UniProtKB/Swiss-Prot annotation:
This is Cobyric acid synthase. Catalyzes amidations at positions B, D, E, and G on adenosylcobyrinic A,C-diamide. NH(2) groups are provided by glutamine, and one molecule of ATP is hydrogenolyzed for each amidation. Gene3D superfamilies: 3.40.50.880, P-loop containing nucleotide triphosphate hydrolases. It comes from Trichodesmium erythraeum (strain IMS101). InterPro entries: Class_I_gatase-like, CobQ/CobB/MinD/ParA_Nub-bd_dom, CobQ_GATase1, CobQ_N, CobQ_synth, GATase_3, P-loop_NTPase. Pathway: Cofactor biosynthesis; adenosylcobalamin biosynthesis. One of its GO terms (biological process) is cobalamin biosynthetic process. Belongs to the CobB/CobQ family. CobQ subfamily. HAMAP family: CobQ (MF_00028).
Length: 488
């Protein structure tokens, strides 16, 4: 099996985008490609067809490669939970919640074994593996416990690409410094340098590139222009919030930026709607007067609920809804809409019962066992008989206390509800907005309140749009990238 590793001089150098593009480029050339990231720390996760949890970025890379996402593509997933702790997912299953020091003491050997086993499994099915590193491969204080970068590259004898973000400045110093800090056997694996996020006249770089290649004896195999990333940074909202600058829109949707927000990829399809403006609202900010509010998923529902209550945002949301506003909650946000959340085992912190927003007649009990599964259901609302696909990832079990005043959103009764006025929507389904007809039907409710015409609902799902985006990214990168040095 041939292996390529993509590492970066810093975080946000563009490793994920370059890796994604290479997966699509090589798949087009006839390679049977799989992505791989040994250890990923991310807020966004994806549930595979087998019910395992993996990083959403690696799922996107799998789609770019034209293959089905599998847990072996990301055997270790760390999901930050706040207070310097993370939930550890090993080969798709939750294994515990630990701090950084305890993680490396308890999980380093387990993690490395999971990585090796996963690579062996992937080698049986694929002839090309495109690996993505994390952060920098040259963090001296972390190298001895790095499970993602050069340890994996050495294990695979991978032809390694070093990516630098020139837009930040200091690109040549970053490259030289990174190479100097690598061990000789690691440096020998670097077969090409990619200068990413370049803006300006390409010829202005020529003298610097000539010097760099002479200094390092490593070719610069690509100068990639700035690409407006179609997928958000996997560990922050920084790119997602700035990605679209729409001057004119019909409706505005406010998404509450919870401290421990997760799966904000749910909102990519809404971002892609030209008539929709998305605003992320901090709990301490003014809510304003949007056309709808969405409370997203979170890694710690109760703690984030308490933040909303302490900041006054909880009352602001309730006041907004009582004045005729539309509110939606997804996953943890769905649980917050209920009357009570019960954590009798202290799984999210202090044991106890916590008052919800009391917008839907629900009681949620936090339980140790996580539900993680893909779902295919039929929607009852806002338009009946619409097929909807998505996935669940949650630890709570929710029951309805007054079934006569809510309507089940889907043919699976427990998956979500809407009130009798179609103003309060709650569901457990991540990826619900990926479903084009359902998304447009829901947006049309907001449009009608403004006296606007309906949008057409017979449109493709976001997965078809995603394919167009992936092709576009691959085309742009391929135009400026020479992979021959890493393929020979």
């Amino acid at each position: 099996m041939k292996a390529i590793m993509v590492v970066g001089t810093t975080s946000h150098a563009g490793k994920s985008l370059i890796t994604t593009a290479i997966c699509r480029i090589l798949s087009r050339r006839g390679w049977k490609v799989t992505p791989f990231k040994g250890q990923n720390m991310a807020l966004n996760s994806y549930v595979t067809s087998t019910g395992g949890e993996m990083g959403h970025a690696q799922a996107v890379q799998a789609w770019a490669a034209g293959v089905t996402p599998a847990i072996e593509m990301n055997p270790i997933l760390l999901k930050p939970q706040g207070d310097m702790t993370s939930q550890v997912i090993i080969k798709g299953k939750a294994s515990g919640t630990v701090g950084a020091v305890d993680y490396y003491q308890q999980y380093f050997d387990i993690g490395w074994n999971a990585i090796q086993e996963s690579l062996e499994t992937l080698s049986q099915e694929f002839n090309m593996i495109v690996c993505e590193g994390a952060g920098s491969p040259a963090e001296i204080n972390l190298k001895h416990r790095d499970l993602t970068n050069m340890r994996v590259a050495k294990h695979l004898n991978a032809s390694t690409i070093l990516v630098v973000d020139i837009d930040r400045g200091g690109a040549f110093a970053h490259i030289i410094g990174t190479l100097e800090l690598l061990e000789p056997e690691e440096r020998n694996l670097i077969k090409g340098i990619v200068i990413n996020k370049f803006r300006g006249q390409r010829s202005l770089l020529d003298s610097g590139i000539h010097w760099l290649e002479k200094k390092t004896n490593i070719p610069v195999i690509g100068v990639i222009p700035w690409i407006n990333e179609a997928f958000p940074a996997e560990d922050s909202l920084s790119i997602l919030e700035q990605r679209y600058n729409k001057h004119t829109t019909d409706i505005t949707i406010a998404i509450i930026r919870l401290p421990r927000i997760s799966n904000f990829t749910d909102f990519e399809p809404l971002e892609a709607e030209s008539s929709v403006k998305i605003k992320y609202i901090h709990p301490n900010d003014s809510l304003g007067d949007p056309d709808a509010i969405i409370i997203p998923g979170t890694k710690t529902t109760i703690n984030d609920l308490l933040v909303l209550q302490k900041s006054g945002m909880a009352e602001a949301i309730k006041s907004y809804q009582s004045s005729g506003g539309i509110v939606m909650g997804i996953c943890g946000g769905f649980q917050m809409l209920g009357e009570v959340l019960i954590d009798s085992q202290g799984l999210e912190g202090k044991q106890g019962e916590y008052k919800g927003l009391e917008l839907l007649p629900l009681i949620t009990t936090i339980t140790p066992k996580k539900i993680a599964s893909q779902r295919q259901v039929i929607a009852n609302y806002p338009l009946g008989n619409l097929p909807v696909i998505g996935y669940e990832i949650h630890q709570g079990r929710t029951i309805v206390t007054k079934p006569d005043i809510v309507k089940p959103l889907f043919n699976d009764y427990d998956l979500g509800f809407v009130d009798s006025y179609d103003s309060i929507w709650g569901n457990y389904l991540h990826g619900i907005f990926d479903n084009g007809s359902w998304r447009r039907s829901w947006l049309n409710i907001l449009r009608h309140k403004r006296g606007l015409n309906s949008l057409p609902t017979s449109i493709s799902n976001y997965r078809e749009q995603r394919e167009i985006i992936l092709d576009s990214i691959a085309d742009k990168v391929n135009e400026h990238l020479d992979l021959k040095p890493v393929l020979t």
